[in-house]
């Protein structure tokens, strides 16, 4: 027997040596590329065989030795909390080879783990999933209820529009400029709002739907280990990973349902006491925007016309024009005074004035009462220009009237001293001219600038005469009509 064993061993050694020699001969005959490939194959075989061999040796405990089994279970219990990095089922090695984990644990480093080490550790499983804690809060549920688009907007084809866009579109449809008789828009009672009962019913329906949806979401999250952060109605911890928390950017004002913002601010506007018939007639089942009460355009026009017809309008014109009379306007003033004096001194104009005053005494009285400049021009000019805000006769008269007082400082510097003194004493000069009519004529050749004084004095005389006749006319003929 020993000889046979020895012979077999020697034969095996010879065959192995022959095999090795044959392989070496083949490698020498092969090209360098093929040699490299064979080397790689051998290395791979070695690795695989070592790994499987080690696993087989570690797992093959003898059934008789109970102590070895106890030690293996202890090792598995110690390794479980360390190696099980996630709650998912993808760490298959830890479940199939618990003894391997003990060996891995002994090979791991004992120092404190840093981020770089945990990322680059060789014994770490390839996939690690983040634990996501999902919480459905009451705020989230209420926000989702209020952000739900209504059935009316779905019928109108704007299901996916935001509340702000719907408000804007409805604002364009219900423009506030309506031609109402009283000058205001439709009153708040005629505007269509949802009553409280309809609103409550709709909210109850939406809350029921929301409860069902949130229950479904919760059950899905419990069954599946990881849910995406874009699930509706759920606020997760990893939503703010993009830089800013979306919940802080949320603008929440009262109720988010479109059309209820103004009734919340002004609760008296929402009519709660409407009956069913009125609600059906006025169409309260639809949303409507509550516009603020604004006057209509015809009412604004009427207000402005009434404002312009007030008795202070002419005086306002005077004040407005007086602001412009700062510079040199002597040429315009002389033209205006000549025109007025020509109109007033015309005999035909005087006769016309008398006829008008005799036929219509109330017109002359009104003209004198409401118009401070009525003595300066004829009544037909007033009647023709009554629709205007400020007639040309008004303007020319007020320009002449303003400059009858002391002239500007430029005029005083330009004129000589006697002329300036004469112009400064203008109230007394009127009476002096009435007593001595030859004084302006004698002063004319003395200075070239005295023509302005001559014209103004002539205009003053004419206005004095017309004022006297105008005030006498109604008194002479009024007893006949009374």
UniProtKB/Swiss-Prot annotation:
Record keyword Cytoplasm present: no
Comp. bias intervals (Polar residues): 439-450
Comp. bias (Low complexity): 220-230, 456-469
PANTHER family (alphabetical): G PATCH DOMAIN CONTAINING PROTEIN 2
Keyword entries, A-Z: Isopeptide bond, Phosphoprotein, Ubl conjugation
Positions of region (Disordered): 198-247, 413-482
Numbered residues of crosslink Glycyl lysine isopeptide (Lys-Gly) (interchain with G-Cter in SUMO2): 196
Alphabetized InterPro entries for the sequence: Splicing_assoc_domain
Domain of life of the source: Eukaryota
Protein name in UniProt: G patch domain-containing protein 2-like
Transmembrane segments: none
Regions of compositional bias (Basic and acidic residues) in chain numbering: 198-214
Modified residues (Phosphothreonine): 91
Any one of the GO CC terms: nucleus
Residues recorded with modification Phosphoserine: 31, 86, 88, 447, 449
């Amino acid at each position: 027997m020993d000889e046979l064993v020895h012979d077999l061993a020697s034969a095996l050694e010879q065959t192995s040596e022959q095999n090795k020699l044959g392989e070496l001969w083949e490698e020498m005959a092969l090209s360098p590329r093929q040699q490299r490939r064979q080397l790689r194959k051998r290395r791979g075989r070695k690795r695989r065989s070592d790994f499987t061999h080690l696993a087989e040796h570690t797992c093959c405990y003898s059934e008789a030795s109970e102590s070895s089994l106890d030690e293996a279970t202890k090792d598995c219990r110690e390794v479980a909390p360390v190696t099980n990095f996630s709650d998912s089922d993808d760490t298959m090695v830890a479940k199939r080879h618990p003894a391997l984990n003990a060996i891995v644990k002994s090979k791991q480093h004992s120092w404190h783990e840093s981020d770089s080490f945990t990322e680059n550790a060789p014994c770490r499983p390839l996939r690690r999933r983040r634990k996501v804690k999902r919480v459905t809060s009451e705020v989230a549920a209420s926000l989702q209820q209020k952000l739900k688009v209504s059935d009316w907007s779905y019928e109108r084809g704007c299901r996916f529009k935001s509340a702000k866009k719907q408000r804007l579109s409805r604002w364009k449809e219900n423009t506030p400029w309506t031609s109402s008789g009283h000058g205001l828009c439709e009153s708040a009672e005629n505007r269509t709002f949802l009553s409280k009962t309809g609103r409550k019913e709709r909210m109850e329906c939406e809350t029921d739907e929301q409860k069902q949806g949130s229950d479904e979401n919760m059950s899905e999250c419990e069954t599946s280990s990881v849910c995406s952060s874009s699930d509706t109605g759920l606020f997760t911890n990893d939503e703010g990973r993009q830089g800013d928390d979306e919940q802080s950017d949320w603008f929440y004002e009262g109720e988010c349902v479109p059309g209820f913002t103004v009734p919340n601010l002004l609760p008296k506007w929402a009519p709660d006491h409407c009956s069913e018939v009125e609600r059906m007639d006025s169409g309260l089942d639809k949303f409507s925007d509550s516009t603020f009460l604004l006057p209509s355009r015809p009412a604004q026009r009427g207000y402005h016309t009434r404002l312009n017809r007030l008795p202070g309008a002419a005086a306002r014109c005077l004040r407005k024009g007086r602001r412009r009379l700062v510079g040199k306007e002597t040429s315009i003033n002389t033209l205006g005074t000549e025109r007025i004096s020509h109109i007033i001194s015309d005999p035909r104009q005087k006769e016309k004035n008398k006829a008008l005053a005799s036929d219509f005494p109330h017109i002359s009285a009104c003209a004198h009462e409401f118009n401070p400049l009525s003595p300066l021009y004829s009544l037909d000019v007033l009647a023709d220009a009554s629709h205007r805000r400020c007639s040309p006769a008004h303007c020319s008269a007020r320009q002449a009237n303003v400059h009858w007082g002391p002239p500007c400082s430029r005029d005083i510097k330009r004129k000589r001293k006697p002329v300036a003194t004469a112009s400064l004493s203008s109230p007394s000069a009127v009476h002096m001219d009435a007593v001595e009519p030859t004084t302006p004529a004698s002063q004319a050749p003395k200075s070239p600038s005295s023509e302005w004084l001559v014209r103004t004095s002539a205009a003053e005389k004419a206005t004095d005469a017309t004022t006297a006749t105008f005030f006498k006319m109604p008194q002479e003929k009024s007893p006949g009509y009374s």
